[in-house]
Amino acid sequence: GKNATVLHYSDNNSKTEDGDLILFDVGAQYEYYNGDISRTFPVNGKFTDRQKTIYNIVLEGQKIVIDKAKAGIEFKSLNCILKDYYAKALSKIGLISNAEEVNKYYYHGVSHLLGLETHDVGRHNEGLLKSGMVMTVEPGLYIAEEGIGIRIEDNILIENNGCRVLSKDIIKTVEDIEDFMKW
């Protein structure tokens, strides 16, 4: 519901309603190294048409960024790539009328480094990606006036010719989520 539009809603005291979305932001640790995954699921098991449209925009944005992520790419360019895509996609569905309005619905970066801290230290938003870096790709859209908050976050390992999605086995398509919710 509306709390999915809050980046890190920690009160955890609201009742979910039929038609709401739940945004899960989940961390895990293995031998002191951290993972950080987000998924968004419909409470009732089915996305509305509008939720599905927004969800698929976020998912496509994530795919675009993952396809561009590789050693030698400027870190901050990934956020620019996503915002350019969002400007076109959100304009196409009538949510915005100019590119500057993207910031109303997308107000965080597309990535952060992972390591001994979930948001690992360093000047990661400057410079080039290097082979061996582990980071998130976490586009989101937060439409408070519609109660829609969607983030899809995966962890990737930067390689010379691309990246490896470390969290690839966690479901994230609309179809897979709705099938999972049937059980």
Task: Give, region by region, the residue ranges found by the protein language model.
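Active-site neighborhoods and metal-handling regions in enzymes and metal-associated proteins
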Residues: G1-W183
